[in-house]
């Protein structure tokens, strides 16, 4: 086989192998995301999280927007922050790479959502983005709520 044909053969082999590896990695990554989502079912299917999503999307519908989609990874981030606020007593934004609404003190999803609706900046957060995550924590009578949007 002449040198040019050998180089062409090697180049084509590498190209095909690279595509196969990339395809396998992509499938593997999709499978990993699916497994992680299933691991978070306890959170995203929780009645309080579902109620927060319902109230959030009712407000979006009221102003003519499509519903936000519940994102399991964002729910986990919001949940971790709500737990942190409840454990530390600090009422502070998390610095996550999302728009974020937090609330401390009110005892129901309705009260937290209404507080966000009545605050212009928080309301604007609710109306932006397509994905949303929620978290909440009650500890020693302290209620902490967190929503993140992107």
PLM feature segments, named:
Residues 10-18:
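Bacterial N-terminal signal peptides
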Residues 17-25:
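C-terminal segment of classical bacterial N-terminal signal peptides
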Residues 30-86:
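A short alpha-helix/helix-coil micro-patch that ends at or immediately precedes a cysteine
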Residues 26, 45-47, 51-54, 96-108, ...:
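Secreted/periplasmic proteins
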Residues 2-9:
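Bacterial N-terminal signal peptides that target proteins for export
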Residues 72-113, 126:
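Short, surface-exposed glycine/acidic/tryptophan-bearing loops
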Residues 65, 99, 129-131:
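Extracellular structured ligand-interaction cores
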Residues 104, 109-150:
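Disulfide-stabilized extracellular recognition modules
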């Amino acid at each position: 086989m002449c040198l040019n044909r050998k180089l062409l053969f090697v180049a084509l082999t590498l190209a095909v192998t690279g595509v196969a590896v990339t395809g396998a990695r992509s499938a593997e990554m999709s499978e990993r995301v699916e497994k992680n989502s299933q691991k978070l079912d306890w959170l995203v299917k929780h009645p309080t999280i579902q109620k927060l999503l319902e109230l959030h999307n009712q407000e979006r519908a009221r102003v003519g927007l499509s519903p936000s989609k519940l994102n399991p990874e964002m729910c986990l981030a919001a949940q971790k922050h709500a737990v942190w606020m409840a454990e530390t007593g600090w009422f502070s934004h998390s610095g996550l790479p999302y728009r974020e609404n937090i609330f401390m003190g009110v005892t129901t999803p309705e009260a937290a959502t209404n507080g966000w609706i009545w605050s212009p900046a928080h309301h604007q957060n609710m109306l932006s983005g397509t994905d949303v995550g929620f978290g909440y924590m009650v500890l020693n009578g302290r209620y902490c709520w967190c929503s993140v949007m992107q």
